[in-house]
Regions:
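Short, flexible segments with low predicted structural confidence
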Residues: 2, 19-20
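Glycine-rich flavin
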Residues: 22, 26-123
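Short alpha-helical segments used as structural interaction elements across diverse proteins
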Residues: 7, 15, 28-31
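A non-catalytic, amphipathic alpha-helix used as a structural packing/dimerization or gating element
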Residues: 12, 16-19
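Glycine-rich phosphate/cofactor-binding loops in nucleotide/flavin-utilizing enzymes
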Residues: 2-3, 14, 74, 94
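Intrinsic disorder at enzyme termini
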Residues: 1-9
Length: 123
């Protein structure tokens, strides 16, 4: 059965994300990045990584927080509200999910770089 109400932890995550994004990623920031031809704000991505967002789907053994897809969805929803420009979906969700299905040292190293915010992926 699908749950319709966020847990207390999920609500705290959403509130925290909303507070950060309201300050760090207003719609004006999106327009500025677009006009400058930039793909994302690298400084903001490092801040997101420091909060564990880049490692939301990365196993703890690789330096992630492994909070699951529900948490990733909450973060994506909050990012969408401010039009935050980040490599979150391509890197923290898609690449991390794909790399979790590979069991070798290269995948583990790549996951660690995702969690730290040192690598971004485009698929």
């Amino acid at each position: 059965m699908v749950k319709l109400v966020l847990t207390e932890d999920e609500t705290m995550l959403a509130d925290s994300a909303r507070g950060f994004l309201d300050k760090s990623a207003p719609v004006k920031a999106f327009r500025d990045l677009r006009d400058a031809g930039q793909t994302h704000d690298a400084k903001m991505w490092k801040e997101m990584a420091a909060m564990g967002w880049a490692g939301v789907l990365v196993p703890e053994s690789a330096g992630g927080v492994d909070m699951g897809h529900a948490a990733a969805g909450i973060l994506a929803q909050e990012m969408g509200k401010t039009l935050a420009v980040s490599p979150f979906l391509s890197t923290a969700v898609i690449a991390a999910t794909a790399l979790r299905h590979v069991s070798d040292a290269r995948a583990e190293a790549a996951l660690a770089k995702i969690a730290s915010g040192d690598a971004t992926y485009a698929l």
